[in-house]
């Protein structure tokens, strides 16, 4: 069923890992382990014939690998047309079809996370009569929108934030003025004066900042997660104008937004949204789409907290919630242990509440199940979507268990004032983990369960047992 292929030069890298002495030995080890295809390393083509002659790799092994690859080529139709996927007309008429672009636009909007929204900075209604200053290196950027590892995607075809906004607000009394202010990576502040002057001419300021796409993905580590270059310095100058200040971020991993969280009115995390990025951003900024995405990773208060993840293992000296400053506990002296924005977090242009959590029984045996229900309500004034999340903690196991694990979630659309019931099922399989014997199984014991709107929301809590 398919074939096994390495990562890029994966076989070659075994030499650097000191597993083998040279490329030839690496190829033999890989071939005998069942690796069918050597991705670009050139080791198989250079050494396998010699290895077979020396009896280090069997011909049967080669035949098996070749057959697996040829079978897949046949199934993909490459024997009929080896260039079938390199067709410009196919790309134009299939991949870039209007309905696919619309799907990409909707996906972009649904991927944006609202991190902060003081004073209802967002949305910027099309009914307003205001001037918006668009400041920052990501306002007119197209190149970075596809993100890292975008393959053959045409970066110049991506829609910029500026294009998306000017199309969205065409014919309205919302006017945009623009200044770049700085570039993405350098400390050059020579464009600050123009940006500040532009901001002062506007009613509100929307800064678009982030990272070069090459700063995310493989082999792109950083020691400082603040906005790079002069971007944060520019934000601080924009803040001094006294104008309401919003920020939209284009980046691929968590940033240290501790200053921004304290001083910026509204923050949207847009990520690298792809071809229709600018339209997706404009849909959210205008309020035509109410943001509903949630963080799939925790954002730290500072790099000193890293690694930081919600499902960490327990410590021997946990911090008492009622006394967070207790000495000789596993805590930081200068910041809370908690993230700035936790896993599962995300705001909306409306508000939601989860309550009335119930379990249909407090214990079950293997082969049984428990149903967890809760009520979610849109307590705000506009329609929206939220993600109701269920977390479980195994209180004691033969192998140390995480303090919390996401075990279920449901995205729920609610009109203003509407309520709905959500339900989750807990069974033996949901509680299983790999034990010290490397067998996956659930162990009898006691568990805590929460239903809420992010990984730190513990307002609705209950307990149950597996007997």
Where on the chain are the PLM-derived regions?
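An anion/phosphate-binding loop that grips the pyrophosphate of nucleotide cofactors and donors
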Residues: 202
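A short helix->loop->beta-strand "cap" motif at the edges of active sites that frequently abuts
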Residues: 2, 174, 241-245, 264
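Intrinsically disordered, low-complexity Pro/Gly/Ser/Thr-rich segments with frequent PxxP/GP/PP motifs
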Residues: 398-434
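Second-shell residues forming the walls of enzyme active-site clefts
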Residues: 1-40, 45-47, 58-61, 68
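Short glycine/proline/serine/threonine-rich loop/turn segments at secondary-structure transition edges
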Residues: 430-446
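Short acidic, flexible loop segments centered on an aromatic residue
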Residues: 381-398, 404-406
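Secreted, periplasmic, or luminal enzymes acting at the cell surface/secretory milieu
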Residues: 19, 50-147, 153-162, 168, ...
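Glycine/threonine-rich flexible loop motifs
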Residues: 143-146, 209-228
């Amino acid at each position: 069923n398919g074939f096994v292929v390495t990562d890029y030069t994966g076989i070659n890298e075994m030499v650097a890992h000191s597993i083998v002495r040279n490329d030839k030995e690496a190829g033999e080890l890989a071939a005998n382990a069942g690796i069918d295809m050597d991705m670009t390393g050139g080791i198989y083509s250079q050494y396998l014939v010699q290895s077979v002659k020396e009896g280090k790799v069997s011909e049967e092994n080669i035949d098996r690998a070749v057959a697996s690859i040829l079978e897949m080529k046949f199934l993909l139709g490459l024997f009929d047309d080896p260039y079938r996927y390199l067709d410009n007309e196919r790309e134009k008429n299939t991949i870039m079809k209007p309905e696919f672009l619309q799907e990409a636009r909707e996906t972009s909007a649904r991927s944006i996370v609202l991190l902060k929204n003081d004073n209802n900075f967002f949305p910027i209604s099309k009914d307003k009569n205001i001037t918006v200053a668009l400041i920052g290196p990501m306002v007119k950027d197209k190149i970075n929108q596809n993100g890292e590892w975008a393959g053959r995607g045409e970066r110049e075809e991506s829609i910029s934030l500026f294009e998306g906004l000017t199309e969205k607000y065409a014919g309205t009394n919302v006017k945009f003025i623009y200044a770049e202010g700085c570039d993405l990576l350098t400390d050059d502040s020579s464009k600050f004066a123009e940006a500040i002057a532009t901001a002062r001419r506007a009613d509100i300021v929307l800064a678009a900042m982030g990272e070069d796409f090459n700063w995310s993905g493989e082999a792109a580590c950083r020691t400082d997660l603040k906005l790079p270059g002069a971007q944060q310095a520019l934000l601080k100058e924009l803040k001094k104008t006294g104008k309401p200040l919003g920020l939209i971020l284009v980046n691929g991993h968590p940033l240290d937004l501790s200053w921004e969280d304290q001083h910026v009115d509204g923050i949207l995390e847009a990520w690298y949204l792809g071809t229709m990025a600018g339209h997706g951003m404009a849909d959210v900024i205008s309020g035509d789409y109410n943001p509903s995405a949630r963080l799939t990773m925790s954002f730290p208060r500072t790099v000193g907290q890293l690694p930081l993840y919600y499902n960490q293992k327990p410590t021997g000296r946990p911090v008492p919630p009622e006394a967070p400053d207790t000495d000789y506990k596993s805590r930081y002296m200068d910041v809370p242990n908690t993230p700035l924005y936790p896993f599962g977090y995300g705001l909306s242009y409306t508000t939601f509440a989860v309550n009335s959590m119930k379990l249909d029984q407090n214990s079950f045996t293997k082969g049984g199940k428990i149903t967890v229900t809760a009520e979610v309500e849109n307590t705000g004034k506009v329609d929206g979507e939220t993600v109701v999340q269920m977390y479980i903690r195994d209180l004691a196991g033969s192998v140390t268990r995480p303090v919390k694990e996401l075990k279920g979630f449901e995205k729920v659309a609610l009109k203003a004032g509407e309520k709905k019931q959500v339900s989750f099922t807990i069974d033996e399989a949901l509680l299983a983990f790999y034990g010290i014997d490397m067998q996956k199984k659930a162990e009898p014991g006691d568990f805590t369960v929460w239903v809420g709107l992010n990984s730190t929301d513990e307002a609705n809590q209950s307990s149950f047992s597996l007997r």
